[in-house]
Amino acid sequence: MEIRWLGNFTFEVRSSVGVVIVDYEGKLPNPTKVKDANTVFVYSSDDDEDHVSNDFQVLTGPGEYEIGGLSIRGVATPADDPAISRKINTVYIVDADGLQVAMLGNPGSQPSAQSVQQISKVDVLIINTESQGL
């Protein structure tokens, strides 16, 4: 597995079965520019219309996904103070090549005990150091 920082909040997790691009900024790239046909884009929040695509698998919320051999879990956590907002941040856990990689996204406050339990044990944790909730 290879993990690369692509700038700002964007990371690439490349495994033997596919690629996960986390929080890609701007419009999705032209499919001919993407090297791996099994590329999945995941977003910790769904507040941008540029995330819609007919060419790529795009995940924008919690759930369990199996895409081309990639196992991806999205766990809901608060994007803001839960007392004032119901917006969610999705923590994604990619399970590939025998490793679990978790991307915290942009949490707005501490996750619940249930969310922490769903995230569980991970091998690599990617944290946005500019997140307001850290």
Where are the regions a protein language model picked out?
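Core dinuclear metal-dependent hydrolase active-site scaffold
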Residues: 1-39, 47-124, 131-133
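Histidine-centered catalytic micro-motifs
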Residues: 44
